[in-house]
C-alpha cells in the first residue's frame, strides 16, 4: 500500500485512497473495487432526474410550506373568543389598545400584567380621555390658573 494519501475527502474523510500517480488508482476509482467501509451508499430512495430541484441553491421563498397557519404563530392559541371554536381570532395590524387616562397610575402594573397575559399581541397603547379624567383635567387647569394668578401679584 505505497503512495496512499489519507487526506483525500471522498464520501468518508481520510478514506485512504491511493494518490493519483499510483498505478492502481484507475482500478480503485470505481466503487466496486473500494472496500465496503469506503463506499458511499445513498440514504433514502433513489432520485431520478425529474425529481431533482431546478435550482442548485436553497431559496426559502421558493419552497412551499406545508405547515398550518396556527403553527407559524404559536401565540395565536390563546386568542380564541370561543374555546370550542378552532379558528383563532384574527387581528389587523397595527393593533391599538385604548387605555383611559384615569387609570394611568392606578394599579397600572397589575392591569398591564393581566393585559399581556390575555392579549399577547404586539400593540400600541393609546391613551384616551374618559369622564373621570376630564373632570380631573378641569380641576387641574383651574388650580394652575389660580396658582399663576397668585404668582403674578
From Swiss-Prot:
Its main location: nucleus. Residues 93-128 are annotated as: Ripply homology domain. GO terms for cellular component: nucleus; transcription repressor complex. It is found in: Nucleus. One of its GO terms (biological process) is negative regulation of DNA-binding transcription factor activity. Expressed in the presomitic mesoderm (PSM) in the anterior halves of somitomeres S-I, S-II and S-III. Residues 127-153 are annotated as: Disordered. Residues 131-153 have a biased composition (Acidic residues). Pfam families: Ripply. A motif (WRPW motif) lies at residues 58-61. Keywords: Developmental protein, Nucleus, Repressor, Transcription, Transcription regulation. Belongs to the ripply family. The ripply homology domain is required for transcriptional repression. The WRPW motif is required for binding to tle/groucho proteins and transcriptional repression. PANTHER family: PROTEIN RIPPLY-LIKE, PROTEIN RIPPLY2. Interacts with tle4 and tbx6, and mediates interaction between these proteins. This is Protein ripply2.2. The gene is ripply2.2.
